[in-house]
């Protein structure tokens, strides 16, 4: 196999209206069959609905929801002594944590029954900003799994500190 090295990171441009990369990442995650205009329409309708009903800046609500859902640690399966163990580790980058959080929010919306995507995404973002909802529960579940598998990690003190620490992961990248 050829050894080409790690693939280059693609630079994402911010979205045209709110000028935020995280909003553009959400649009790309909602995208279906290459119809980006429909994805933009869904996201902007949700943001309009947030500003009307919650009387808050929709980008701030979105960032708050994203920070509440971002995992601090992840669990990787490793093969040790003939068995597969779940080994927790601190999240390697803020980019990865943000991408996982967006993926969880969108998948939680898609799993909800009935209604249109606008109302499902609105309810999930508002619940995540209030530390509720399916995506937030998924993060809590992952952290519990990491705590229960602490004995498999090399540095359990770092993992405990990352989970219990209330400060957010540094977003120096975006």
From Swiss-Prot:
Keywords annotated in UniProt: Chloroplast, Plastid, Ribonucleoprotein, Ribosomal protein, RNA-binding, rRNA-binding
GO CC terms: chloroplast; small ribosomal subunit
Matching PANTHER family: RIBOSOMAL PROTEIN S7 (PTHR11205)
Family that this chain belongs to: Belongs to the universal ribosomal protein uS7 family.
Subunit and partners: Part of the 30S ribosomal subunit.
Gene Ontology MF term list: rRNA binding; structural constituent of ribosome
Organism phylogeny: Eukaryota, Viridiplantae, Chlorophyta, core chlorophytes, Chlorophyceae
Pfam families: Ribosomal_S7 (PF00177)
Species of origin: Stigeoclonium helveticum
InterPro entries noted in UniProt: Ribosomal_uS7, Ribosomal_uS7_bac/org-type, Ribosomal_uS7_dom, Ribosomal_uS7_dom_sf
Superkingdom assignment: Eukaryota
Coiled-coil zones: none
Keyword Ribosomal protein: yes
Cell compartments where the protein resides: Plastid, Chloroplast
NCBIfam families: rpsG_bact
UniProt-listed HAMAP family: Ribosomal_uS7_B
Record has Ribonucleoprotein as a keyword: yes
Annotated protein name in UniProt: Small ribosomal subunit protein uS7c
Job of this protein: One of the primary rRNA binding proteins, it binds directly to 16S rRNA where it nucleates assembly of the head domain of the 30S subunit.
GO annotation, biological process: translation
Gene: rps7
